[in-house]
């Protein structure tokens, strides 16, 4: 697996590594070395030669030093991360965290280390996935384990390589320590992948085989992937990929390796992560879903099949449909070019090469000669070079107007008018229809790149005829609620050249607010404020909401909506509820009322987590959360994980929200500066709903209504057991669990149950050891934010809870409450045997131990 050639017999070396405090790249200083270690010499990647002191051509080896952090420091593994490196979610599926390069390109021959850890026994090393073996000679070994964060460094997060093409680090032993050597240049954004040197493993034997197998098995094998594991036919080990299995058989079962390669050829194994194959399938489904959108027929390529019939395929399409490969007769083509990594098939070999280059290898062979920016496809390079040409024209003639087309509805600009039209059609459809109506779009643009609207009630309306015919005479105004698309679905070739253009029905869209509807009737009942020419809302008194419900004071724009309202007067509806005598004008409203109020029935069930809902809208909102999680997992597994490093300390995060919370908690003086820097980004989302009492803003009206100040004093949900009132129904349900003893949230590891889900989340941190709340002054970590706040009060000396009687201050309200009992004289803890009462619980416990035990 290693790129290094076989080494000559190891020689005695007198080397010690010392890092420089000012420069990340240091050299090796010669000192006396312990000759009891069975070390390997250094290796020069440039001249492919081994050396002991220094290379005759390139000098001594270079090292990247760790950031200084004393042993025993909490989270030392993160604090030792060198400058330019960050830790984030690994691009290998289910591999956990990984190390990424965010600085300059790491050159060949750069060394990292040594690997820090705690020396453990052989039995513990065989059960750990973070152990390395140190060979001391004469079959004597020591084991370094990085399980504890207080004794390890950042090298514990480097994941194992799945193939030789992925490997960019080589692990070897030098001076009784494990070092990593860069065997391939590591560009910015790439992840560190390590594999051991062959000469290092030769003298370790079966013990190293078991330890390394534990590393490979722990990386990527979960219960969900148990069916995809590759078991070894000669022992009980199982591996997540065939590459790991081949390395294991070659190392542990060398006599059976020749027979094994015949039955399990490595060439057919796709070392692509499983989620990457799923991503390809999702891309195929998305390509199929785009068939309902209009696309152009020119420019096209005519691909002749064996039958001599033409197959049309759009030239600019990045990936044709993998699941639908058609000939002119509707049959599947005989010549299929299949991808060995994900199984997708293509009509032409060039499309297969482009797919492998853009999806799997991430190769970008097309580079700009001016700015050195690279692209995976030639079309992207052409579009990019067009920007340079426009810049040169503007420099040569400053008075010449720039060919930049800004969008009037947002801040984006485009170098081509057709790109602006496509942007308007997708994101500002109302403005796009206005341009079509005013004639700003040319006939060529309408024909090739747009959707056009027809009104079948218009006497001048003519359906699309055979061939390619301009449709500009058939355009209708903005008020047209129905649209038909001129074009053919993507990837579906016509049966012959004279085939009629397909007519695709699109959902009606309101031209004022750009909201889409399922049918025309819903669009007609929809009412929204009209806009003037500048885009501002113009209220018309005659169109205001004039129909008001007498019970709930809710206003409606027309009488039909008011009649369909649930709060209509008794006797006005045709459908009566048998439980509460409420009348409804529609049967569906009555059924929904019975289901949500009386029967508590939840017929809408999620197929993923089996959670049930009373209404279909709740199920749809819930399913969106699963889709977001799935797309996030697929994108994080297929592409390099997004890393958000903190600019004020060495911590890094995989989500920008976590980074902002970290800055707000540990760098409060920088939080406002960070927010101003993020203007227009994710964190500066518009929040139009503001609370006048606490000045807190919300992005949605639902979040504003659920705010505590909104319902302050309004407690409408009473507990039937103790009479306590609540403002929210969910709060009442959680409170009733105290009376019923129900604990629905159970820990899967120890079986302990909890009333609230938040209690379970905090409890799970006791199993994982996670302490995400870090004190910025002493470095101590805590599982809960409340523990951190109480701890920070020790540093600040602030005691916010003050007794109004004597003025004594306390850091916790519980301590103040117990102190106030001394002034009142209340003794809440009586003894059940003698009747004596006490003000403190520990006083009662001490009384039991002395008097009654």
UniProtKB/Swiss-Prot annotation:
Reaction(s) the record says it catalyses: L-lysyl-[protein] + S-adenosyl-L-methionine = N(6)-methyl-L-lysyl-[protein] + S-adenosyl-L-homocysteine + H(+); N(6)-methyl-L-lysyl-[protein] + S-adenosyl-L-methionine = N(6),N(6)-dimethyl-L-lysyl-[protein] + S-adenosyl-L-homocysteine + H(+); L-lysyl(4)-[histone H3] + 3 S-adenosyl-L-methionine = N(6),N(6),N(6)-trimethyl-L-lysyl(4)-[histone H3] + 3 S-adenosyl-L-homocysteine + 3 H(+); L-lysyl(36)-[histone H3] + 3 S-adenosyl-L-methionine = N(6),N(6),N(6)-trimethyl-L-lysyl(36)-[histone H3] + 3 S-adenosyl-L-homocysteine + 3 H(+)
InterPro entries membership: PRDM7_9_PR-SET, SET_dom, SET_dom_sf, Znf_C2H2_sf, Znf_C2H2_type
Gene3D superfamilies per the UniProt record, alphabetical: Classic Zinc Finger, SET domain
Listed CDD domains: PR-SET_PRDM7_9 (cd19193)
Record: residues binding Zn(2+) 6: 831, 834, 847
Keywords: Activator, Chromatin regulator, Chromosome, DNA-binding, Meiosis, Metal-binding, Methyltransferase, Nucleus, Repeat, S-adenosyl-L-methionine, Transcription, Transcription regulation, Transferase, Zinc, Zinc-finger
Residues binding Zn(2+) 2, per UniProt: 407, 410, 423, 428
One BP term from GO: double-strand break repair involved in meiotic recombination
Domain SET: 83-197
Binding site for Zn(2+) 5: 803, 806, 819, 823
ZnF locations on chain (C2H2-type): 230-253, 337-360, 366-388, 405-428, 508-528, 547-569, 575-598, 604-626, 644-666, 689-711, 717-739, 745-767, 773-795, 801-823, 829-852
Post-translational modification: Mono-methylated; automethylated. Tri-methylated; automethylated.
Location in the cell: Nucleus; Chromosome
Chief site of localization: nucleus
PROSITE patterns (UniProt xref): SET, ZINC_FINGER_C2H2_1, ZINC_FINGER_C2H2_2
Residue sites binding Zn(2+) 3 per the record: 747, 750, 763, 767
Binding site for S-adenosyl-L-methionine: 275-277, 341-342
Compositional bias of kind Basic and acidic residues: 450-459
GO cellular component, one term: chromosome
Binding site for Zn(2+) 1: 235
Biased composition regions of type Polar residues, renumbered to the chain: 291-314
General function of this protein: Histone methyltransferase that sequentially mono-, di-, and tri-methylates both 'Lys-4' (H3K4) and 'Lys-36' (H3K36) of histone H3 to produce respectively trimethylated 'Lys-4' (H3K4me3) and trimethylated 'Lys-36' (H3K36me3) histone H3 and plays a key role in meiotic prophase by determining hotspot localization thereby promoting meiotic recombination. Can also methylate all four core histones with H3 being the best substrate and the most highly modified.
Subunit structure: Homodimer.
Protein's recorded name: Histone-lysine N-methyltransferase PRDM9
